[in-house]
Amino acid sequence: MSRKSVMSSTFEPSLSTSRQPLGPSLADTLPSINFGFDELRDRMAKFTAKFDAFIEQGRKRVLEERNQFRMNVAELQEDQRMKKKDIEILQLKTNTYQQTMAKEAAETREMQAAIASLTEQRDKQAAMRDALKEQIAATQREIDARLAAQRAHAAQLEAQARYNVPELDFWVTNLCMRIEGAGAEDRLKFVYTHIDERNWEREAWFELSMSGRDYDVRHCRPKLEREKVEKVLDRVNETRELVVLLKGMRELFVEAMKS
């Protein structure tokens, strides 16, 4: 029941009472009092309208805030998803970079090992080259010394030959021998005949080497004892007289033919 009906029923006289043909009642004699119910109703209506508007605005604001919150959450979720994707990409790049660095480090170690090996080989080859250079230089010095000795010896022989040609012709005739080349510049072949009483045409020969300072007999036919040949060579190299060699070798051949 509304307040208007309640108040009407409370303060207004009933129909039965108003219908009674009585004289003025005590209530009719009371002064009229204005309680301001209309103004109160207007104020209540305005308050209700304001309250409803406030509630509606609050509801709209709550909806807007909820929608904004949902949008913010969606944006945050999207940002989180993008950040997660960025992190995955960065992690993949980091793994790739680490693998590349490890590969480069391994390649660097291999290159350093190869460089060390090549350096060691270079040092060995340099040492070997220096040793070969020294060996070549020593060999060249030895060759030069031998060539100088040979030239000196050849000059000596040439000088001696100029004086010994008549004597050599004498011994060639008397020792029944001839001189031939032995296929080398520093060798001579001496061939004897009339050393075998049973066959005067039988020949014996030896090759004389003059490549060094001392004379040396390299080959002979028939073969002679090396010790006896060395004794003859010792006398020749001591006296430097070729006739000693020619006579000594003939004696050895005659002795060999008789045995």
Swiss-Prot record:
Residues 1-25 are annotated as: Disordered. GO terms for cellular component: Ndc80 complex; nucleus. Pfam families: Spindle_Spc25. Residues 1-20 have a biased composition (Polar residues). Its main location: nucleus. Residues 59-162 form a coiled coil. It comes from the Eukaryota. Disulfide bonds: none annotated. One of its GO terms (biological process) is cell division. Acts as a component of the essential kinetochore-associated NDC80 complex, which is required for chromosome segregation and spindle checkpoint activity. Belongs to the SPC25 family. This is Probable kinetochore protein spc25. It comes from Neurospora crassa (strain ATCC 24698 / 74-OR23-1A / CBS 708.71 / DSM 1257 / FGSC 987).
